[in-house]
Regions:
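Glycosyltransferase donor-sugar binding loop
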Residues: 1-7
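Short alpha-helical donor nucleotide-sugar binding micro-motif in glycosyltransferases
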Residues: 27-28, 34-38, 53
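A short, well-ordered alpha-helix in the C-terminal region of glycosyltransferases
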Residues: 100, 107-123, 132-135
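Acidic donor-binding loop of glycosyltransferase active sites
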Residues: 36-50, 63
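C-terminal alpha-helical cap of glycosyltransferases
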Residues: 126-144
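Conserved acidic donor-binding segment of nucleotide-sugar-dependent glycosyltransferases
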Residues: 79-80, 84-91, 100-106
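Nucleotide-activated donor-binding/catalytic signature segment of Leloir-type glycosyltransferases, i.e.
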Residues: 7-26
Length: 144
């Protein structure tokens, strides 16, 4: 990520006293294991991504997601149901969403997990995404 933004996030983590709780990771080879270790997954990109892959992967593992409110995250995260969307680059909003996520009860987390898994199964399986892509081609390409 961006060094300045990472430093801002680290400062926010310090301000809320969560240094031993929140871990900003670098590259990881075993993402399913990383997701299973997480109570909440953050995808705080400052530039829009075409598809919110991190959010979709985390949701498939039943993890709530806090994501920047732009790009593909708007399709993969349902604000208030499967996670939270925050303005890109707004570390205060990110900290507030994280505070909310970390203070959820077990029952609330379980509800979010069920919603997240259901959302991925309904919209982001390979057959569903292929069907959606083919439907777009069918709509756009002229028939002979």
């Amino acid at each position: 990520g961006r060094t300045g933004y990472r430093e801002e996030l680290e400062a926010q983590i310090g301000r809320i006293g969560a240094e031993g709780i929140i871990h900003l990771t670098g590259p990881c080879r075993d993402m399913p294991a990383a997701y299973m270790l997480a109570d909440v997954v953050i995808s705080a990109s400052t530039d829009p991504e075409a598809f919110g892959r991190v959010a979709a992967e985390a949701h498939a593992m039943g993890r709530p997601v806090i994501a920047s409110d732009h790009g593909g995250a708007r399709e993969t995260v349902i604000a208030g149901e499967t996670g939270w969307l925050v303005p890109p680059g707004d570390s205060d909003a990110l900290a507030q969403a994280l505070r909310t996520a970390l203070t959820m009860t077990t029952e609330e987390r379980d509800t979010v997990a069920r919603r997240a898994i259901a959302h991925v199964r309904e919209h982001f399986t390979k057959p569903q995404m292929c069907a959606s892509t083919l439907a777009v081609y069918e709509e756009l390409l002229p028939r002979k």
